[in-house]
């Protein structure tokens, strides 16, 4: 038997609930479900600030890395570790975050995560070394992962039933606003001395303010009931719903908590209610979220844009700001229209457009003849000084550059003479050419050469940027928000939290693998072929969505769960790929003629197996 879906359980994005009518009232929702006053809204917005902090931390490394890699002379692998260390922390937190949230509370977890984010950011700006950078980023990763889980659960549990989807979706909207804010910060401090410190430090005041504000907000009433504090839970519900009698909602919460004990974690891997199929669908879906390349665009946006012709840090950061703007603009209509268009439709459209834009970007990049083939920096100090001359201008090669002069003092006359062609190969604009560095004895893998902007035709550069923006927009309406909505719908309430924790761990794990190898893979095969690989993955995700993801538009959670609980669900979905929403809705039995009813009765009794129904005239 399929358990009744728990509408009080935590959900993500626009979770659908079953409409409830009270006797004789004609109202679609009971009184306690209609109470969504200003206090509930402000509490949700305050908690959703965590989403802004998460988005900011995800996007800020894109611009900060341009300065840090030069300052610390980071190698390709070291850059990947700086980026991926945040994901390492997030993965660790996703494995244990659910236990912490259930033991200490959702509100407390948000407060702790805000404080940890501020502490990690403070570590980054006070002391700069490679090791400290890794430690600080891991701390921030733990913070954003913990806050992501706690925020969605907290908002879902304080929101009334009919406003839960809207209020929980605030978190997703705040994430993309945070990413946009990070890209704006990258541009604002691109040419500022030690601008990376300002980039990392801007979130500290906001994190502290959120922690203080959350202290004065009430705990989740559901958490209080879990801890046996029903009196306190009743008072909190009274404030949130502006009602004096909260008995009915308390009864619903207690009933839903009983449902959760019907399942264990291991039921996710058993055939009970087709759970094994459901978890495989969920894990595969989050796999495609990461393997289609979006995390790398997020983390390495400025680096990618520099490789296609946006030469200066400022130009690359400004272009990446467009990525943030597109994400915000695309996410808003997707959030508002998902109940009308359907999550499966958005997933199909998003994957299709992603594939088209990626193949366009790959073809364009094949026709951009750059002066370099590698985007990794050397960790050699002499190469660092030479690279700084390109990034910060030819003035760094003058006799006023004490760092470079000290290097010359420590090398032999023969080695020094090998660098002399550099002087003669600097053209009128003071730019170092590829040939000059090669004549100096430096291999392609030991430096990053920034090309003359004139070497890249303007229309190719802007076409590449346009393809990137279309790719980002397609992801933002499809594989960005929709998988989390699907995940919140395909699992019963009694096991949804544990299923979400498992898929979240899978999400961060694949993210770690992708971000940890992006520069290395790009260095080996080139950016165009990376785009082509992501194209194949996008097409594979489209095929998977068409074959396995149900269209849940207009269906209640109970109807969705009943359909997915069928043993032959996957077989039916593959054979009949034209599933529509109405097929998930149980149909009312049609009235049949007496002859048909008799035939059906005989079949059930085993006496009419060979009989055929005569055609009606």
From Swiss-Prot:
Membrane-related topology note: Multi-pass membrane protein
Positions in the Extracellular compartment: 66-80, 137, 194-197, 300-317, 367-466, 520-528
Biased composition (Polar residues): 8-17
Residue ranges of the TM segments: 45-65, 81-101, 116-136, 138-158, 173-193, 198-218, 279-299, 318-338, 346-366, 467-487, 499-519, 529-549
Pfam families the UniProt entry points to: Sugar_tr
GO BP field: circulatory system development; D-glucose transmembrane transport; hexose transmembrane transport
Range of residues in the leader sequence: none
Keywords carried by this UniProt record: Cell membrane, Cytoplasm, Glycoprotein, Membrane, Sugar transport, Transmembrane, Transmembrane helix, Transport
Compartments reported by the entry: Cell membrane; Endomembrane system; Cytoplasm, Perinuclear region
Tissue: Predominantly expressed in skeletal muscle, heart and prostate, with lower levels in brain, placenta and kidney.
Domain of life, source organism: Eukaryota
Region (Disordered): 1-29
Positions bearing carbohydrate: 371, 383, 396, 401
GO cellular component, one term: plasma membrane
Reaction(s) catalysed (UniProt annotation): D-glucose(out) = D-glucose(in)
Molecular-function GO term, any one: D-glucose transmembrane transporter activity
Role played: Insulin-independent facilitative glucose transporter.
Assigned protein family: Belongs to the major facilitator superfamily. Sugar transporter (TC 2.A.1.1) family. Glucose transporter subfamily.
Official protein name in the record: Solute carrier family 2, facilitated glucose transporter member 12
Source species of the chain: Homo sapiens
């Amino acid at each position: 038997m399929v358990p009744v879906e728990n509408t009080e359980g935590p959900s993500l994005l626009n979770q659908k609930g079953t409409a409830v009518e009270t006797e004789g009232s004609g109202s679609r929702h009971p009184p306690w479900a209609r109470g969504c006053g200003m206090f509930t809204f402000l509490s949700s917005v305050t908690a959703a600030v965590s989403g802004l902090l998460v988005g900011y931390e995800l996007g800020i490394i894109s611009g900060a890395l341009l300065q840090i890699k030069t300052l610390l002379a980071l190698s390709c692998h070291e850059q990947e570790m700086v980026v991926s260390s945040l994901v390492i922390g997030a993965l660790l937190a996703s494995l244990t975050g659910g236990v912490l949230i259930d033991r200490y509370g959702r509100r407390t977890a948000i407060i702790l995560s805000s404080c940890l984010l501020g502490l990690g950011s403070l570590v980054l700006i006070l002391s700069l070394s490679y090791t400290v950078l890794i430690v600080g980023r891991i701390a921030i990763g733990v913070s954003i992962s913990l806050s992501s889980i706690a925020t969605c659960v907290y908002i879902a549990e304080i929101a009334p039933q009919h406003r839960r989807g809207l209020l929980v979706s605030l978190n997703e909207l705040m994430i993309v606003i945070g990413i946009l804010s990070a890209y704006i910060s990258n541009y604002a401090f691109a040419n500022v001395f030690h601008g990376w410190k300002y980039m990392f430090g801007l979130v500290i005041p906001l994190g502290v303010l959120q922690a203080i504000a959350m202290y004065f907000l009430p705990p989740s009433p559901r958490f209080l009931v879990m801890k046996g504090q029903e009196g306190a839970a009743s008072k909190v519900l009274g404030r949130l719903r502006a009602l004096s009698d909260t008995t009915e909602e308390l009864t619903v919460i207690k009933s839903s908590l009983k449902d959760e004990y019907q399942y264990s974690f291991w039921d996710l891997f058993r055939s009970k209610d087709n759970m094994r199929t459901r978890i495989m669908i969920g894990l595969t879906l989050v796999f495609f979220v990461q393997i289609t390349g979006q995390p790398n665009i997020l983390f390495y946006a400025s680096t990618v844009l520099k490789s296609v012709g946006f030469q200066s840090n400022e130009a690359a950061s400004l272009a990446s700001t467009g990525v943030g703007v597109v994400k915000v603009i695309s996410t808003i209509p997707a959030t508002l229209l998902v109940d009308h268009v359907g999550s499966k439709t958005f997933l199909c459209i998003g994957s299709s457009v992603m594939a088209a834009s990626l193949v366009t970007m790959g073809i364009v990049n094949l026709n951009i003849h750059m002066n370099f083939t590698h985007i990794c920096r050397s960790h050699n100090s002499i190469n660092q000084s030479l690279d700084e001359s390109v990034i910060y201008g030819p003035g760094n090669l003058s006799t006023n550059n004490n760092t470079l002069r000290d290097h010359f003092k420590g090398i032999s006359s023969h080695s020094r003479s090998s660098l002399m062609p550099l002087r003669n190969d600097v053209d009128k604009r003071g730019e170092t050419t590829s040939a000059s560095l090669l004549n100096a004895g430096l291999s392609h893998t030991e430096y990053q050469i920034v090309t003359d902007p004139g070497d890249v035709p303007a229309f190719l550069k802007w076409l590449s940027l346009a393809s990137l923006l279309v790719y980002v927009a397609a992801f933002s309406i499809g594989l960005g928000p929709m998988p989390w909505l699907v995940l919140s719908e395909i699992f019963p309430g009694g096991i949804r939290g544990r299923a979400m924790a498992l898929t979240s761990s899978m999400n961060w794990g694949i993210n770690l693998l992708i971000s940890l190898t992006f520069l290395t893979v790009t260095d080996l095969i080139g950016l165009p072929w990376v785009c082509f690989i992501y194209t194949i993955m996008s097409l594979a995700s489209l095929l998977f969505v068409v074959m396995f993801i149900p269209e849940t538009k207009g269906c209640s959670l109970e109807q969705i769960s009943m359909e997915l609980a069928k043993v032959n669900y996957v077989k039916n979905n593959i054979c009949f790929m034209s599933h529509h929403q109405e097929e998930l809705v149980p149909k009312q039995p049609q009235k049949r003629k007496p002859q048909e009813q008799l035939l059906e009765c005989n079949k059930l009794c085993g006496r009419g197996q060979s009989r055929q129904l005569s055609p009606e005239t």
